[in-house]
């Protein structure tokens, strides 16, 4: 069985719900941060080849200092998160812990149209039983299968940046709210990955459901930035078809 990923999109979301410039890289050494700041572009996607970056460009030193300060702050937060006892994603314990907690992935359904969802409230309060067989949902199975591949792609494109895996993290101020981020980089940048089963990926667009999910995750982790990644994967059984698709 052969796999091909069609495209990957990187978007930056800040915790104030404003989508900023699309950014394809963060890095741990100052020169790379400088080049990253110089290469930022509004409403566009740009891959940066660090071997071709001109480090002599005139830039705002205050902006550089602020960026480095932010990264250092994020790293301190990351260090604290790593020390916390966490519940590994998709384990029996993880599913049980989510049953009576509102999680970041529930936010859109819980408050869409400015209305509180009675059905979600009843499930979380265990007034009604949630009989959903999540393993039988094709879109969830698809995303779970390809998420590790998308994570590796993201890491490789970003100079093999280390990504820490997290399970359920409970809000320190509200034990009834939690989040399970897909990962957090060594720079303290959150990563949220979607591998849609059938939904078309649209450039410069993040579904509202996922915007709210990311805001919830950032709030729980006390972080401010998230790279949102979407990967479209194709499963191709025939080698000739694979070669044809690859060449296209």
Provide a role label for each language-model segment.
Residues 154:
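Active-site region of the double-stranded beta-helix
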Residues 157-181, 185-248:
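Nucleic-acid nuclease catalytic cores
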Residues 147-151, 211-214:
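Short, well-ordered alpha-helical scaffold segments within catalytic/effector domains
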Residues 1-145, 149, 157, 235-237, ...:
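Charged, glycine-rich intrinsically disordered N-terminal tails and low-complexity linkers that flank
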């Amino acid at each position: 069985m052969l796999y091909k990923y069609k495209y990957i999109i990187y978007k930056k979301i800040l915790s104030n719900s404003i989508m900023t410039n699309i950014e394809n890289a963060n890095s741990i050494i100052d020169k790379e941060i400088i080049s990253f700041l110089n290469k930022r572009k509004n409403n566009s996607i740009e891959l940066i080849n660090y071997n071709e970056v001109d480090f002599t460009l005139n830039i705002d030193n205050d902006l550089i200092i602020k960026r480095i300060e932010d990264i250092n702050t994020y790293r301190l937060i990351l260090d604290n998160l790593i020390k916390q006892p966490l519940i590994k994603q998709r384990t029996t314990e993880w599913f049980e812990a989510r049953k009576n907690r509102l999680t970041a992935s529930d936010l859109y359904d819980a408050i869409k149209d400015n209305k509180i969802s009675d059905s979600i409230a009843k499930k979380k309060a265990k007034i009604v039983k949630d009989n959903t067989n999540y393993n039988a949902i094709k879109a969830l199975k698809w995303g779970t299968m390809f998420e590790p591949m998308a994570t590796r792609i993201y890491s490789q494109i970003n100079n093999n940046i280390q990504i820490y895996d997290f399970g359920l993290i409970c809000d320190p101020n509200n034990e009834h709210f939690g989040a399970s981020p897909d990962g957090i980089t060594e720079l303290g940048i959150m990563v949220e990955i979607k591998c849609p089963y059938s939904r078309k990926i649209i450039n410069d667009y993040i579904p509202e459901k996922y915007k709210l999910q990311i805001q919830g995750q950032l709030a729980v982790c006390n972080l401010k930035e998230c790279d949102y990644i979407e990967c479209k994967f194709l499963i191709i059984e025939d080698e000739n078809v694979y070669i044809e698709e690859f060449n296209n």
